Amino acid sequence: MLGAALRRCAVAATTRAGPRGLLHSARTPGPAAAIQSVRCYSHGSQETDEEFDARWVTYFNKPDIDAWELRKGINTLVTYDMVPEPKIIDAALRACRRLNDFASTVRILEAVKDKAGPHKEIYPYVIQELRPTLNELGISTPEELGLDKV
């Protein structure tokens, strides 16, 4: 019902005619624009860090994961306000290798470097933790490929 009221307000605002008969948006909001905000709190339990890590490791370890699910998982993981744990990145890199998707491996490593932001010690730590996996899977870092100089 709230969505319908918002749609009516948006339609009414965009269909008002100006002096020459042209459509323009209204400068002053109508009475329907005075909708109060509603707080939507979840009363569910909070996910612990261990549960979060296990959920993502399980997601990337699915044997039947396809390229779309891999990219969706990576995109969702990147939207969180944190740097993923090395074990999550390890599982994602292994999923990329199962799908022979080298471009996604580079993208994951670049995203980790970007998420680390000004904290210059995080990315080298993650690479150090992932070095055995990178060597095992034959994955080069963006720095080894020269992509950091582009």
UniProtKB/Swiss-Prot annotation:
Gene that produces this protein: COX5A
Question: What are the annotated GO cellular component locations?
Answer: mitochondrial inner membrane; respiratory chain complex IV
Q: Name one GO molecular function term.
A: metal ion binding
Membrane found in the keyword field? yes
The transit peptide region is found at 1-41
Residue positions of the PTM N6-acetyllysine?
A: 87, 113
User: How is the subunit organization of this protein annotated in UniProt?
Assistant: Component of the cytochrome c oxidase (complex IV, CIV), a multisubunit enzyme composed of 14 subunits. The complex is composed of a catalytic core of 3 subunits MT-CO1, MT-CO2 and MT-CO3, encoded in the mitochondrial DNA, and 11 supernumerary subunits COX4I, COX5A, COX5B, COX6A, COX6B, COX6C, COX7A, COX7B, COX7C, COX8 and NDUFA4, which are encoded in the nuclear genome.
Pathway(s) served: Energy metabolism; oxidative phosphorylation
Q: Where in the cell is it found?
A: Mitochondrion inner membrane
Protein family: Belongs to the cytochrome c oxidase subunit 5A family.
**Example of a GO biological process term:** mitochondrial electron transport, cytochrome c to oxygen
Q: Which CDD domains match?
A: Cyt_c_Oxidase_Va
A Pfam family it matches: COX5A
Question: What is the protein's known function?
Answer: Component of the cytochrome c oxidase, the last enzyme in the mitochondrial electron transport chain which drives oxidative phosphorylation. The respiratory chain contains 3 multisubunit complexes succinate dehydrogenase (complex II, CII), ubiquinol-cytochrome c oxidoreductase (cytochrome b-c1 complex, complex III, CIII) and cytochrome c oxidase (complex IV, CIV), that cooperate to transfer electrons derived from NADH and succinate to molecular oxygen, creating an electrochemical gradient over the inner membrane that drives transmembrane transport and the ATP synthase.
Q: What protein name applies here?
A: Cytochrome c oxidase subunit 5A, mitochondrial
